């Protein structure tokens, strides 16, 4: 996710949405940001490979970490802990690019609801009926907005089904303020293996 920032700004500067090979225009910015992550981490760089998302959830929830890079969906993992809802917020990831004071949050999804057109007709209809139920029934809307605390971008969600998630509310404030959201560009990355290799290289760098 962090590697999306230099790609986003390169695409934006060049007026493109994809490319066969990035130029690396903002790799120095990316390095400086990652260095900050390493030096201000809750552990020594040599221990980073042993840390898990559960560690990050616990450290933030207990107030041991000030910043925690994640999305609105992570609220369920950190709520009802030492850090109260009113003390949680969200910040854009700044990398030192001109004009980023108008930057909003990274928004979007790399996962989507899909229906396999090659499935049996009855299975297709059952799937469509279920998806409709999820976003139109009282139980489904209550589950998404209150129990899961997800963003609710559907027309079927009125003020009675606004998310109770304080991170969703914080994200909404950036939209209301007219900040420019940062798109995710995962679909333009070569493969999952490519992302894994980038992660391995970053870990090797962090450990010296």
Feature roles, as predicted:
Residues 1, 55-58, 75-81:
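Pocket-flanking alpha-helical
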Residues 1-22, 65:
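Extracytoplasmic/periplasmic solute-binding protein
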Residues 18-50:
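Glycine-centered hinge/linker elements that transmit conformational signals in sensory
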Residues 40-42, 81-148, 200:
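Extracytoplasmic/periplasmic substrate-recognition and gating elements
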Residues 47-62:
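Short helix-initiation/N-cap motifs at beta->coil->alpha
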Residues 53, 70-75, 109-111:
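Beta->alpha turn/N-cap motifs
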Residues 62-70, 86:
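Alpha-to-beta junction loops
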Residues 107, 150-156, 169-208:
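C-terminal capping/gating helix-and-loop segments adjacent to ligand/active sites or protein-protein/ligand interfaces
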């Amino acid at each position: 996710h962090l590697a999306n920032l230099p790609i986003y700004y390169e695409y934006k500067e060049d007026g493109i949405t994809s490319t066969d090979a990035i130029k690396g225009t903002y790799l120095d910015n990316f390095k400086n940001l990652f260095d900050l992550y390493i030096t201000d981490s809750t552990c020594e760089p040599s221990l980073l490979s042993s840390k898990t998302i559960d560690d990050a959830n616990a450290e933030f929830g207990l107030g041991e970490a000030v910043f925690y890079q994640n999305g609105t969906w992570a609220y369920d993992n950190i709520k009802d802990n030492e850090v109260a809802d009113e003390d949680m917020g969200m910040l854009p990831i700044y990398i030192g690019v001109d004009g980023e004071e108008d930057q909003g949050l990274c928004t979007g999804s790399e996962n989507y609801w899909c229906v396999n057109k090659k499935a049996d007709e009855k299975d297709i209809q059952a799937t469509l009926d279920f998806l409709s139920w999820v976003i139109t029934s009282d139980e489904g809307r209550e589950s998404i907005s209150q129990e899961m605390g997800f963003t609710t971008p559907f027309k079927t969600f009125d003020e009675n089904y606004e998310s109770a998630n304080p991170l969703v509310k914080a994200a909404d404030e950036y939209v209301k303020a007219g900040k420019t959201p940062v798109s995710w560009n995962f679909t333009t990355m070569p493969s999952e293996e490519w992302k894994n290799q980038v992660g391995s290289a970053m870990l090797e760098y962090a450990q010296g």
